[in-house]
Swiss-Prot record:
One MF annotation (Gene Ontology) recorded for this entry: bis(5'-adenosyl)-pentaphosphatase activity
Cofactor(s) named in the record: a divalent metal cation
Protein name from the UniProt record: RNA pyrophosphohydrolase
Function: Accelerates the degradation of transcripts by removing pyrophosphate from the 5'-end of triphosphorylated RNA, leading to a more labile monophosphorylated state that can stimulate subsequent ribonuclease cleavage.
Gene behind the chain: rppH
Native source species: Roseobacter denitrificans (strain ATCC 33942 / OCh 114) (Erythrobacter sp. (strain OCh 114))
Pfam families: NUDIX (PF00293)
Sequence ranges assigned to domain Nudix hydrolase in this UniProt record: 10-154
């Protein structure tokens, strides 16, 4: 695909979850499908007709095994935050239908224990997970998502 063709593609609607524990640390998972250190917060597509908040709670459950009853939604981003994939990834992901993702983010407070987290889900996304100080998030994320993570941190700053 040429850069011009990619620029004409839409963004995939997606939600992201910033899950914080009682110490103010943020859940990140190491992606299973990446050989390099590619940590990220839980995220995933919004199904047609699905409410974004419901999608965020579903994605949290699907990717971390966290029961939605243990996650309190504290805030959400006002806007949808887009990011573009690197050109070489566009044809490999989502059958080349999207240039990247447009994400609605939710800050959730985790009211469970570490033992309530189970990344060995039906369709595992992560090979390992950890709690990370919010200040260390951006440097641990793949470069093409860093601007979105900066915007998410800015949006939720009053709650961190």
């Amino acid at each position: 695909m040429t850069p011009e063709e990619i620029a004409r593609l839409p963004y995939r609607p997606c939600v992201g979850v910033m899950l914080m524990n009682g110490q103010g640390e943020v859940f990140v998972g190491q992606r299973r499908d990446n050989n390099v250190a590619a940590w990220q917060m839980p995220q995933g597509g919004v199904e047609k007709g699905e409410d974004p908040r419901a999608a965020a709670l579903r994605e949290l459950w699907e990717e971390t095994g966290v029961n939605p009853e243990l996650a309190e939604v504290v805030a959400e981003t006002e806007d949808w935050l887009p990011y573009d994939l690197p050109y070489d990834l566009v044809p490999k992901l989502w059958k080349g239908r999207y240039r990247g993702q447009e994400q609605k983010w939710f800050l959730m407070r985790f009211h469970g224990a570490d033992s309530d987290i189970n990344i060995a889900t039906e369709h595992p996304e992560f090979s390992q997970w950890r709690w990370l100080p919010a200040a260390d998030l951006v440097e641990n994320i793949v470069p093409f998502k860093r601007d979105v993570y900066v915007a998410v941190l800015d949006a939720f700053e009053a709650h961190l």
